[in-house]
Amino acid sequence: MSQPAFKIIIVGCSVTGLTLAHCLDKLGVEYTILEKRSAVVLQEGASVAVMPNGGRILDQLGLYDAFEKATVPLDLTDAYLPDQDFRFTSDYPRRVLATFGYPVAFMERRGLLEILYDGIADKSKIHLNKGVTHVEQNDDGAKVHTEDGEVYEGDIVVGADGIHSKTLREMWRMMGEPVVNGIAQSESQNMSVAFSCVFGISHDVPELQPGEQILRMCNGSTIFVMGSKGVVFWFIVTQLNRRYEYHDAPRYTTEEAAAFCEARKDAEIKEGVTFECIWRKQHVFNMLPLQESLFQTWSHGRVVCIGDSVHKMTINLGQGANCAIEDVTVLCNMLRAFLAEKREKKPSYSEIDTLLRRFNKEHLPRASTIVETSRLTTRVHAQVGISQRIMTRWVVPYFGKFLQGKPLGLIASGPVLDFLPLKRASYPGWERYRVKKSSRGAGFWITAFLSLSLLAVAATMYGWGNSQIWADWNIL
């Protein structure tokens, strides 16, 4: 009698969960998706950035063409500092496209979900209104129980259910972890909330062109505005009055969000354009606390969590969805090799536990680098601290082109699916900027970046600004 097919239960029909489904389809691995909501695509007012490291994986899966047709690449970024008379223009988005063959581009989150959902051949594998109540596992497999009394069985349970992940909390329960105020005691220092964000989408704003990006850095807040096809995506990220924990983070009503925006309608976005020009054309908006987290333990037994459930960052770096897509990529690469080795033999509980622990250990440093870089970027944009103010006023405007190696390296060092061909591998930036693995983590590079900032100020003072040495360094 043949063994039943190896099967994965995905909790969450998110960008993460649907990307995983596409990868499993390519691998020929059975799966079921459980989604607690009544629809896959809902209008929530959120947009999502797809960077080259995420875009090339979507391209491997045959999904990028639809995304590319629906978006406009960012071209130049006009950055304004609190001093209204000081601004500079960065060609970083343009350089990203030339370097990797993929642009920085935004679209509505629901639009990306539609692309991912439409690409699923067998939609009967997706089950809506399936809120998870509890998970159990043993030597024979895993069972996921839902609110309607149904039970779904598989070999691995993957939590792709976001920041408030039920799967993660079930994993903590099975580990015997004490949970205090919604977070495992051992992870309590690994999540905090220090910023809020109002994000919105406006239609028909003629003052802003497709591909135009404006970054308005203020003391304690940042305004982002990106023009696309007939719409404008915008965010206002604001530092909170203190650092909050998960359970006591502020929650905002629609009325509070509207009042927040009304109070800022006179804020200048660019010459002749105030925030009111965008706000009065808003189609949808929302206000949320921005959690920042990097949990250390992602798996236990047959259960593994990925995406926002284990690492969450602010929107400033634009890597949230891309980091989740990378999680899927690394997990599926390891799963492919694992199942090929097992052939027809059913993997044991211990073997699966070892596989998922190895995934956690090997991918955690990459996720940590992205989360820490995002954390620094957010504070630089909001002018939090003297070092950050020095960086934005004296370093980036004059030396930004020479310091782009680090963010380009962050993109180039992302993983790819090792069982599908690359579509735009010929672009030289992937190899040129790829960072070799080393013991130097994000903390080292952040310290180096701040140190170089001070050195660059000295260089400006002493007239070194045009020296070729800065171009040759290209380390940050």
From Swiss-Prot:
Q: Which Pfam families match?
A: FAD_binding_3
Sites carrying a glycan are 190, 219
InterPro entries assigned to the protein according to its UniProt record, in alphabetical order: FAD-bd (IPR002938), FAD/NAD-bd_sf (IPR036188), FAD_mOase_fung (IPR050562)
Q: Which domain of life is it from?
A: Eukaryota
Q: Where in the cell is it found?
A: Membrane
Provide the primary localization. membrane
Membrane topology classification: Single-pass membrane protein
For this protein, the Enzyme Commission number is: 1.-.-.-
Q: Which GO terms describe its molecular function?
A: FAD binding; monooxygenase activity
Output the Gene Ontology cellular-component terms.
Answer: membrane
* Gene3D superfamilies given in the database record: FAD/NAD(P)-binding domain
Q: Any idea what job this protein has?
A: FAD-dependent monooxygenase; part of the gene cluster that mediates the biosynthesis of the diterpenoid pyrones subglutinols A and B. The first step of the pathway is the synthesis of the alpha-pyrone moiety by the polyketide synthase dpasA via condensation of one acetyl-CoA starter unit with 3 malonyl-CoA units and 2 methylations. The alpha-pyrone is then combined with geranylgeranyl pyrophosphate (GGPP) formed by the GGPP synthase dpasD through the action of the prenyltransferase dpasC to yield a linear alpha-pyrone diterpenoid.
Query: Which family does the similarity line name?
Result: Belongs to the paxM FAD-dependent monooxygenase family.
Q: What is this protein called?
A: FAD-dependent monooxygenase dpasE
